[in-house]
Amino acid sequence: MKRLLFPLLVFLTLPSVLHSSHSNNQGELVVTSESTRESIELAKYLKDNGVVKYSAYWCPNCLNQSELFGKQAYRELNVVECARDAINSQTQLCIDKKIKGFPTWEINGKLILGVLSLKELSKLTGFKN
């Protein structure tokens, strides 16, 4: 257990040595792409169905995932911020859920690690537009 927990704790504190152009100086992810009607509908569906994205504001893959949705749709998602130094950090929840990397999606109680296309998310959750 200690062998798994230590790398996670190091990973969660890594942003103190990183500077990222996709985050602001307040520890928040900054999404710049525009959303489509479909991505907004999907984001609302995911939120309404309890889907959660575990993320870290300094994580490049998290930004890539968020940019697929666009800034308007991103605001609709249930996002748990795992970085210890972030605004609204929920690090303990991430540890309790055994989040091993970012982004991680929780869909129907199952954790899925990695960037997922909107099509993949639709298929995994039963979303039909």
Regions found by a protein language model. Give the residues of each.
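Structural micro-motif
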Residues: 94-107
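N-terminal targeting signals for export/organelle localization
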Residues: 1-28, 129
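Non-catalytic, surface beta->alpha helical segment in thiol-disulfide oxidoreductase systems
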Residues: 106-129
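Transition segment at domain starts
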Residues: 25-38
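Local sequence-structure signature of Cys/Sec-based thiol-disulfide redox active-site neighborhoods
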Residues: 35-76
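Gly/Gly-Pro-rich "capping" loops immediately C-terminal to redox-active cysteine motifs
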Residues: 68-85, 122
